[in-house]
Amino acid sequence: MIRTMLQGKLHRVKVTQADLHYEGSCAIDQDFLEAAGILEYEAIDIYNVTNGKRFSTYAIAGERGSKIISVNGAAAHCADVGDILIIASYVTMPDEQARSWQPKVAYFDGDNEMKRLAKAVPVQVA
């Protein structure tokens, strides 16, 4: 059996730009991409915490150290500057590998400062 697993996640990054007329994509600070193990041109899913919209695009490298999160092209209709996003990429693998898989998760504050890195999402308590 093949499973699709979370590969990397940027948790609660803030949109710094939204450019309807830029070639479609999402520009992400290179430091953020590396922290989550997301490659340039990799497919990503974006979950807008602010407005509830969910959409797919691909990652492009933003200037290293700039803290840029720029939603571009048609996707700019789905996010405004200041919106809080979760950006995720996924990987497929055999069931045996998936059972011990650990994603790369980067957590951010409201100013796109990376606060911590983790290899799991915490267990949700009741």
Swiss-Prot record:
Species of origin: Cronobacter sakazakii (strain ATCC BAA-894)
A GO CC annotation given for this chain: cytosol
Domain of life: Bacteria
Subunit structure: Heterooctamer of four alpha and four beta subunits.
Note describing how the cofactor binds: Binds 1 pyruvoyl group covalently per subunit.
Main location: cytoplasm
Pathway(s) the chain acts in: Cofactor biosynthesis; (R)-pantothenate biosynthesis; beta-alanine from L-aspartate: step 1/1
Listed CDD domains: Asp_decarbox
InterPro entries in the record: Asp_de-COase-like_dom_sf (IPR009010), Asp_decarbox (IPR003190)
Pyruvic acid (Ser), modified sites: 25
GO BP annotation list: alanine biosynthetic process; pantothenate biosynthetic process
UniProt EC number: 4.1.1.11
Protein task: Catalyzes the pyruvoyl-dependent decarboxylation of aspartate to produce beta-alanine.
Key words of the record: Autocatalytic cleavage, Cytoplasm, Decarboxylase, Lyase, Pantothenate biosynthesis, Pyruvate, Schiff base, Zymogen
Post-translational modification: Is synthesized initially as an inactive proenzyme, which is activated by self-cleavage at a specific serine bond to produce a beta-subunit with a hydroxyl group at its C-terminus and an alpha-subunit with a pyruvoyl group at its N-terminus.
Record-given protein name: Aspartate 1-decarboxylase
SUPFAM superfamilies: ADC-like
Pfam (any one): Asp_decarbox
Active site: 25 (schiff-base intermediate with substrate), 58 (proton donor)
Cofactor(s) needed: pyruvate
Alphabetized PANTHER family for the sequence: ASPARTATE 1-DECARBOXYLASE (PTHR21012:SF0)
GO molecular function: aspartate 1-decarboxylase activity
Family classification: Belongs to the PanD family.
Taxonomic lineage of the native organism: Bacteria, Pseudomonadati, Pseudomonadota, Gammaproteobacteria, Enterobacterales
Annotated catalysed reactions: L-aspartate + H(+) = beta-alanine + CO2
Binding site for substrate: 57, 73-75
